[in-house]
Amino acid sequence: MKVTAEIDVMPKEYFKHLCDITIKDIKKSTNKEVSLKDLLDGYHYEKIVPFKKREAIISMSVGPLIEDKYFIMKYETKDTKCLYYYDFSSKDGKNYVTYSEENNYKKDTIGNKLGTLKRKFDEKALKRRIFNNIELTTTYIKNHREEK
């Protein structure tokens, strides 16, 4: 699935926000300090999340990234592989972000086939949620800009 939206912040600001929240997630998940350079070069970590009264291990990979242009994240669980990226561009004085994601199940089960079918039916609602998330992110960025 791919969605392109106009954003009213600079691509550099949106990219920095994505890196900041990723760095915070790495710190929370691993208690390790990482830098933007670590993300640009590519970084891998594991996080543990609650899942159905148990814990699930998610293998996360970010990057390599192209600063202010391209942000990519992959994650993998025992059942699923997911890839998503943000591609930033400017045209005619306007800024755009293209968000794309791919989800793949590792096993070909009836439940996974039904999940894929359901996702196709829900695609319109999912695109709407993605647009809303992009809008909320730009609002957050504008409201938290550093005073210059």
For the regions a protein language model found, what residue spans apply to each?
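Glycine-rich portal/gate segments that line the openings of hydrophobic small-molecule binding cavities
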Residues: 32-79, 132, 136-147
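Hydrophobic ligand-binding cavity/cleft-lining segments
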Residues: 1-41
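Beta-strand/loop substructures that line and gate deep hydrophobic ligand-binding cavities in soluble
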Residues: 76-132
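Hydrophobic pocket/interface hotspot
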Residues: 14-18, 24, 62, 73, ...
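Beta-strand elements of well-folded, non-transmembrane domains
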Residues: 7-11, 51-53, 64-66, 79, ...
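Intrinsic-disorder/low-complexity, polar/charged segments enriched in Ser/Thr/Lys/Arg/Asp/Glu/Gln
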Residues: 1-6, 57, 70, 83, ...
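Extracytoplasmic electrostatic interaction patches
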Residues: 13, 44, 48, 63-66, ...
